[in-house]
């Protein structure tokens, strides 16, 4: 029997559909690029906190539909089924359905507007090991080396999505920023 959406599914996913936060789990070529970028950031004095590297399809499914339903971007009945995830998105009432989905969004710590304006993808680069969610922080100006050795001065900005200089440094290492999702970097910027 299906279990209604809600915080149960966060606990379930933490056992049955875990994320990784280890760089070692990334695709080998992207892993090298990420290591080099993070080393450059740390050598310049930045702190880097990694929240996610790889993600299972089941977790991506739960992220996607809980976000869309909680934000009113679709009806619970729009959610497709996924083998191995016996969830009931429709609580028989749209407000209860949205509340159950929102419990999941909060439990998973998903970015919602204005931090992220798009739902987590069903076919995320995280599934392929080609994306990383990380927070980069520092105070003042950061003098960081691009891959070619050029030093770039990057001023701290609270809104990382708008910090184009930081994005340029990452891109020089093959780590591209998705500008609509604060922590997300990948091999292709998606």
Regions found by a protein language model. Give the residues of each.
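Cell-envelope/glycan interface and biosynthesis
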Residues: 2-179, 186-190
